[in-house]
């Protein structure tokens, strides 16, 4: 908001969240003075457009299959925070199948915009710096889905998830799965799959987690 500095905007978000109000927040950083965020047309138009453009949401069967284990563990009507929600796919599935009021946290502006366009409340926040906008015990469930392997401080993220929710559901790619190990052994290359579609030089995954 052009009327408030960033710290005051965050205080407003915290107050609205504590009061149980619907709130989304995004902070576009700029180093060229007051109102200079208005010059960042590429990002500003996408963020604002997310609130103005409501996309039709259809939950596909493959999306249900992808998140079936999370669906089993979330009770109907629960309050859920999806930490690292991406484009909001999991929130779409939970809303359609469990009647869940789900919110998200996302740092990527383009994926943030997509989740907001799907009608979800999303907080723009770097989870490596904590979830300062979310009060203690505010949610029934915190979901950390395919996010833990991308953050610098996984332990800190898990502590934050259990601070803001009664329980946490954590999913991640199993980097020791036999198919991955076999591909690595036979080709000598980082495996690429639907769940891990990245090359070694552009992957966001910085931890190889296994069971």
Identify what each model region corresponds to.
Residues 130-136:
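Short conserved loop adjoining the S-adenosyl-L-methionine
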